């Protein structure tokens, strides 16, 4: 297809089905065409729109995007933690062969030990009246685990995060720092023996030095326990360091997905490159120069036609307004939803052919 304004050829059909083949049938978690809509003040707001991905056992998938991109909503939808009132969830979420949407409340409780979530602000998810050792063992208590086994598993979970029952005994959440509270939250998730943990901005509210410690801790625990992680963040640099694969979200849709190295070194989508503009780097040659293209405020209740990023995109052409791009295979292994994707490496990156 040729864009009338530019004269460039736009391949809108090639590789559109390749992404379906990219999704794995043997994944631990399979998400297909997930959509979430909220009704607010008589209007429908689309938070997530047709998102598909999967997570293999022991894999970390990063979800990255600006505030309002839908990443946290996806995490909560996977665990059925969204409010039922004025919320509509469509699509298919399958965990270990079970359709999560079809599970009754009792069946969902039965698999909750396998699917856990760590929140950005751990203190708000703690009961301030309870002692920390009871908070860590709360899930085990709900499962009816005997006290002796419960204490043993609490000890193991605390040890995995660099703490001990002696350290927390008799103390409550407000007596610990933010980093310690996040470690306690991780221990609480680990105690029930999960196979997949959704980490929702787990380091966003922490100091940089503490962030590195928590990220390294999650990496060590993942390898030790063969855990699958979904790591949600607005910071592409953080996501890249912790993830096997990265999905970039914009206005509720995945615009690029692939390995961290492919996306960081060869960002194909203009929005991915814009996210990289915000990453501080010591080497000035590595910095992507911000675009001077003016941006417009976008409505979640009435998104623009065609490509949703086109009103902020320096490469937008006429076809971008008339036809929505689909995720298609890029030369370096990732998939991107763009009519005019970048092919050049990010500034400062020396590719294999240049070495």
Range-by-range predicted roles:
Residues 87-99:
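Conserved ABC transporter NBD signature motif
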Residues 121, 129-141:
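Q-loop/switch helix immediately C-terminal to the Walker
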